[in-house]
């Protein structure tokens, strides 16, 4: 119970502090490595501020929170002290994540990979000691699990500090030789990090809320949901890895002013993410029953989980689009609009669709999985639109023309000049003026054609007979519309 309450908050804090990655990568691209210590210190200060808020919130609100959950006395005791150990977890994370951003960008992602591969072993040893009470330690049960997690993160922080201080490339001594901060670094860290952290929190809270609605379909449906969700989260690590790599690579290329290289990284990231998603989605669908059997011996739960895994295959394909784009946008330090789009996709698309299908169809628990697929699909679509907009803005290219909307005005017809004015100049007033001119010219041309028909003159007979028409009407018309005269428009 304590873990369920804490993990959405923990993921949000990590998302906030990982904003250091694009900031540091762009500095490296601009060859301004001397400014890296300011970013690291800014991240640590922000992290410690979050830790202080979390600590204060725990001591002020823990009693009311646990009372509102109406837990059994034994469960409440474990949850209370498990969450107390999480205070230490947040403290160690607040100092460790900025250092990880530094090693990932200024060093190599293999550094953090090697250190985090040690975490399960370390955590297993601490769990053995504190959960079951071996080696002279008290058997603390669930509280021991929290204590083991806290000590594991403390051990990892020590390893990161050791690596940073020993490496000349990472400049560890410069980081801790001064406490100087710059307000612009703090502000930029928050501008990039807060939307990232909030988007993670909103997404994880939605998934947690869906469990509440699924509870009325019985324990089998809940267990099957957790199986499918756990496997989908495991597979999700592939697009997340691509996203993190793209953040570093794109930010470094943009910092160096090499947009061509940034586009190459973007294409490579999509190829890897989509290729991996197609393989994992195919594997999920083909072996869905076997996957469920790995998690449980209950045939009914495994069967339901197999059905849910089909929907999770849809997630994988959509995530292979939206997640890398989020990494690209973070590399460009564009996170605020992405956060709004994520909220719209999940809380404005996924959640209402899930409730609608649940109340208006007989799909049962499948309603929420279809809603989740719809939400992730909306997220992918909106992320594509945002990326296209940001790319055009960086290139100085105009946005796609919306001049076709003028055709919806009653009695109006669009014209080349109006298209040109809107798409290139964004001058709506000029477009309206040219539309008026176009309408007037059409009326004059219609009257002229009517007179020609009445006089039964063949205007195709000789060039001389139509020369006055060209000079008096058509040339002026074409000059107004396309900027030069052309015989192609002569009737």
Question: Where are the regions that the model predicts?
Answer:
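Positively charged N-terminal leader segments that act as targeting/secretion signals
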Residues: 416-417, 431-434, 439-440, 454-457, ...
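Small-residue-rich hydrophobic transmembrane alpha-helices
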Residues: 1-56, 93-112, 211, 224-288, ...
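Short runs within selected transmembrane alpha-helices of multi-pass transporters and secretion channels
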Residues: 14-17, 86-104, 112-123, 145-161, ...
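Transmembrane helical elements of multi-pass membrane transporters/channels
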Residues: 85, 89, 96, 119, ...
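Transmembrane alpha-helix boundary and packing residues in multipass membrane permease domains
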Residues: 22, 63-64, 128, 196, ...
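Helix-terminus/linker motif at the lipid-water interface of multi-pass membrane proteins
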Residues: 1, 66-73, 129-140, 201-234, ...
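Short alpha-helical transmembrane segments in multi-pass integral membrane proteins
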Residues: 24-91, 137-194, 250-315, 357-423, ...
